[in-house]
């Protein structure tokens, strides 16, 4: 199924005519994924204003100075053929179906309610998972913003 995120998958299954009790009893985990370009080793440190980082989804705690924000090297190198990117990296949202989630499915909860429950359970959405890859220096903020919804 193609959906924008893991919680929307449950809506899609309902729209396909599956009864809520069948969904709740048979689905144990949902994964959503996106591919982002991986920064080449020639990556360069980037300066982005704090308000823009917060607007992208970083928290104040994320901006503690313990990591460096990298972007693609504008000139690139031989390995990346001047693009600043080399290869791809997966960004994932993995949502196990908990008992609380099953109850919401049985009551025909919409994707927004399911999303809220997922956050309460500590499940990272695609954007949050992408921002983690940015903090790790694997991909750029621009790339994560391009392939995820906020």
Question: Where are the regions a protein language model picked out?
Answer:
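Short, flexible helix-loop junctions that flank or precede catalytic/ligand sites
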Residues: 1-150
């Amino acid at each position: 199924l193609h959906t924008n995120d893991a919680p929307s998958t449950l809506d899609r299954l309902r729209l396909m005519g599956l009864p809520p009790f069948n969904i709740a009893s048979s689905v144990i985990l949902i994964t959503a994924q996106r591919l982002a370009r991986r920064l080449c080793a020639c990556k360069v440190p980037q300066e982005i204003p704090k308000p823009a980082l917060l607007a992208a989804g970083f928290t104040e705690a994320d901006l503690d100075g313990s990591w460096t924000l990298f972007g693609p090297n504008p000139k690139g190198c031989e390995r990346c053929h001047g693009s600043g990117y080399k290869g791809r990296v997966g960004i994932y949202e993995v949502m196990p179906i908990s008992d609380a989630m099953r109850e919401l499915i049985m009551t025909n909860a919409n994707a927004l309610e399911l999303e809220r429950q997922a956050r309460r359970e500590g499940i990272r959405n695609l954007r949050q998972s992408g921002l983690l890859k940015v903090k790790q220096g694997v991909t750029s903020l621009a790339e994560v913003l391009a392939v995820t919804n906020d």
